[in-house]
Amino acid sequence: MANRLEGKVALVTGGARGIGAATAERLAAEGAHVVCLDIPADEETLNTTVAKIGGAALPMDITDPDAPQKIATYFKEQHGGVDIVVHNAGVTRDKTLANMKEHLWDMVLSINLGAILAIDEVLLGDKIINDGGRIVCLSSIGGIAGNMGQTNYGATKAGLIGYVAAQSGEQAGRGITVNAVAPGFIETRMTAEMPFMIREAGRRMNSLSQGGQPEDVAELIKFLTTPGAVGITGQTIRVCGQSLIGA
């Protein structure tokens, strides 16, 4: 079935590249109007992505204190609301806890978790997310099993697992589903910056013995936003090739 999202409006954070861009493409292919949000420093790449899908760009830092209200105002004024919210934006700043500077801890928690809570508080509180809407958060295998040197990252991704479990019940009355997707090793710019040996180990520590592609994750996210996923909420679903980490 094509155009299962015809008439729907979607927000994808971290939408300039990687999983975010792949998700935006999949949602647009199903008929949704997709608004991609990313930091102003990536505006050129962001514009390229939205031009490809016929969407709209929203250059913004989600950690800015006024970002949630700006997002809410944009969707209320431009579209009367939003149907799909994909919280994809995230970063890593890896250090063992003993060597982690406070600003690195704070940065990861702010982007990966705090900003999501702040945005949803406004979008849900002001009923900008329409009845029957979909919220999908990007968690990680690192939030299920944890990885050495990723205490900050793992804490945020584990936090999202608890967040969707709690929010799903709160939003059920309006027919809004809230789920998370937990990718394993995915071939993105972020993983490409890992040291070679760590990157190769990440690729091979699953039953498929290969890294996943952004499109693999995007396909699941797309499904969770469609009418066929109306019965799925409060869940965290892995896309990891049966990762040996957290098995």
Regions found by a protein language model. Name each.
Residues 132, 172, 177, 232-234:
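Short, small/polar-rich loop/turn modules that mediate ligand/substrate recognition or access, typified
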Residues 145-148, 222, 233-247:
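Short C-terminal tail/terminal secondary-structure segment
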Residues 30-46:
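Conserved glycine-rich Rossmann-like NAD(P)H-binding loop of the short-chain dehydrogenase/reductase
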